[in-house]
Swiss-Prot record:
The chain crosses the membrane at residues 243-263. Residues 264-513 are cytoplasmic. InterPro entries: FN3_dom (IPR003961), FN3_sf (IPR036116), Ig-like_fold (IPR013783), Interferon/interleukin_rcp_dom (IPR015373), Type-II_Cytokine-TF_Rcpt (IPR050650). Residues 1-21 form the signal peptide. Residues 377-389 have a biased composition (Low complexity). It comes from Mus musculus (Mouse). The gene is Ifnar2. Residues 22-242 are extracellular. Belongs to the type II cytokine receptor family. The modification Phosphotyrosine is found at Y335, Y510. This is Interferon alpha/beta receptor 2. The lineage of its organism: Eukaryota, Metazoa, Chordata, Craniata, Vertebrata. Disulfide bonds join C39-C123, C85-C93, C210-C227. Glycans are attached at N42, N58, N65, N78, N84, N149, N191, N195. GO terms for biological process: defense response to virus; immature T cell proliferation in thymus; regulation of transcription by RNA polymerase II; response to interferon-alpha; response to interferon-beta. Heterodimer with IFNAR1; forming the receptor for type I interferon. Interacts with the transcriptional factors STAT1 and STAT2. Interacts with JAK1. Interacts with USP18; indirectly via STAT2, it negatively regulates the assembly of the ternary interferon-IFNAR1-IFNAR2 complex and therefore type I interferon signaling.
């Protein structure tokens, strides 16, 4: 009160404050001359911090500035000023870092200077930090269909006084419906640092629940009530912050995946490398257990046999009446008389040597062969001199045959074989050629068809069946005998055939070369 402070002392106190303002410590007797100001000094643990607060009884007085001084009672020391609580207008001060001994008693002196008339007063008391009550921590509640999550936030604790106090003081969570207390929960808090969550279960939907926290201390400082109404359709599990976080994460993942897919389609990443089969482990299991190869559909193939007839040389030795008969080029035995040029026979020889009676059966062919052999033996022996080639004078006793040997192939193929003088040259690709040696040129005019039959038997057991043409059903018609002067070989060595060692006499006037 202003009445308790004399005006004369104002100047002295002001002088003392100015002198001691620069001092960190002063003796307790320095405040003996200050008048006392009635006040209340309290200490509490608020949010794990040791808070010293005071309150003046005369609340109607003018505002004032406060300076805090303290000292330990058990120690004979001077008063120490708290820097962060010097000349301040707040009525509280954090002394957590200053008062480290919980069981000690501290002497507190607060110098009060009124700003109106500059009167100085003091307010002092004895404080024990171990007796400081605990204020409840800050907390949040989240309601669900049938339960409530209570989350408490404990700041980091650096003072041993606070740690010991929180471990020894029971913690209470009061659950109430309206004004009636439903239940009190006393969870055991092992860790006083960080967040702690407690679940209130077995709650009724559509009900308004209120929650309050406090430490069961003397005096107990209770937190204000926080209420929530449980909704029946409200799902449990996630809060709004969790939903926002999940939504943001999904959007980031979608953007990342879309970017990767776009870059892959453009061709900037994930390029395909054609690795060798040795480094291809894509079908590694099939190497160990090979799969059965799938069956393949096979189309049926129908084979249609076709008989292709070979084109044969068609030789016509007689008139046009025999042109429709097929005359092959080779016999089964490999011998032929075709491909040789000679002079034609006379008219009498043409009429007598008609080839209209071909041999069709083996028995009749054998009889005719015997008859032809007998006729040939009756002929007078002719000299073995080989006849001249086709280049002799055509004005001789025999006229050239009018029917020229014709080829059954097209004219374009054998055009190169035609020679001057109506002579036709054929390539005879056989191992041997039979030539008949005539002793008399006049004797060939009266030869009959049976005498002109050629026997190609190389042994006594050969029959006329060897004369059948390969690939045909008919036998070769007998050929008219040619004079020795009209027979010639392909190489033009007919003159050396008489003296050649390779010529062999096969009988009946024939020699084989």
């Amino acid at each position: 009160m202003r009445s308790r402070c004399t005006v004369s002392a104002v100047g002295l106190l002001s002088l003392c404050l100015v002198v001691s303002a620069s001092l960190e410590t002063i003796t307790p007797s320095a405040f003996d001359g200050y008048p006392d100001e009635p006040c209340t000094i309290n200490i509490t643990i608020r949010n794990s911090r040791l808070i010293l607060s005071w309150e003046l009884e005369n609340k109607s007085g003018p505002p004032a500035n406060y300076t805090l001084w303290y000292t330990v009672m058990s120690k004979d020391e001077n008063l120490t000023k708290v820097k962060n609580c010097s000349d301040t207008t707040k009525s509280s001060c954090d002394v957590t870092d200053k008062w480290l001994e919980g069981m000690e008693s501290y002497v507190v002196a607060i110098v009060i200077v009124h700003r109106g008339d500059l009167t100085v007063c003091r307010c002092s008391d004895y404080i024990v930090p171990a007796n400081a009550p605990l204020e409840p921590p800050e907390f949040e509640i989240v309601g669900f269909t049938d339960h409530i999550n209570v989350t408490m936030e404990f700041p980091p604790v650096t003072s041993k006084i606070i740690q010991e106090k929180m471990k020894t003081t029971p913690f209470v969570i009061k659950e109430q419906i309206g004004d009636s207390v439903r239940k009190k929960h006393e969870p055991k808090v092992n860790n006083v640092t960080g967040n702690f969550t407690f679940v209130l279960r077995d709650l009724l939907p559509k009900t308004n629940y209120c929650v309050s926290l406090y430490f069961d201390d003397d005096p107990a400082i209770k937190s204000p009530l926080k209420c929530i109404v449980l909704q029946p359709g409200q799902e449990s599990g996630l809060s709004e912050s969790a939903i926002v976080g999940i939504t943001t994460s999904c959007l980031v993942v979608m953007v990342f995946v879309s970017t990767i897919v776009m870059l892959k389609r453009i061709g900037y990443i994930c390029l395909k490398d054609n690795l060798p089969n040795v480094l291809n482990f894509r079908h590694f299991l099939t190497w160990i257990i090979p799969e059965r190869s799938p069956s393949e559909a096979i189309d049926r193939l129908e084979i249609i046999p076709t008989n292709k007839k070979k084109r044969l040389w068609n030789y016509d030795y007689e008139d046009g009446s025999d042109s429709d008969e097929e005359v092959p080029t080779a016999s089964v035995t490999g011998y032929t008389m075709h491909g040789l040029t000679g002079k034609p026979l006379q008219q009498t020889s043409d009429t007598s040597a008609s080839p209209e009676d071909p041999l069709h059966e083996e028995d009749s062919g054998a009889e005719e062969s015997d008859e032809a052999g007998a006729g040939a033996g009756a002929e007078p022996e002719l000299p073995t001199e080989a006849g001249a080639g086709p280049s002799e004078d055509p004005t001789g006793p025999y006229e050239r045959r009018k029917s020229v040997l014709e080829d059954s192939f097209p004219r374009e193929d054998n055009s190169s074989m035609d020679e001057p003088g109506d002579n036709i040259i054929f390539n005879v690709n056989l191992n041997s050629v039979f030539l008949r040696v005539l002793h008399d040129e006049d004797a060939s005019e009266t030869l009959s068809l049976e005498e002109d039959t050629i026997l190609l038997d190389e042994g006594p057991q050969r029959t006329e069946s060897d004369l059948r043409i390969a690939g045909g059903d008919r036998t070769q018609p007998p050929l008219p005998s040619l004079p020795s002067q009209d027979l010639w070989t392909e190489d033009g060595s007919s003159e050396k055939s008489d003296t050649s060692d390779s010529d062999a006499d096969v009988g009946d006037g024939y020699i084989m070369r």
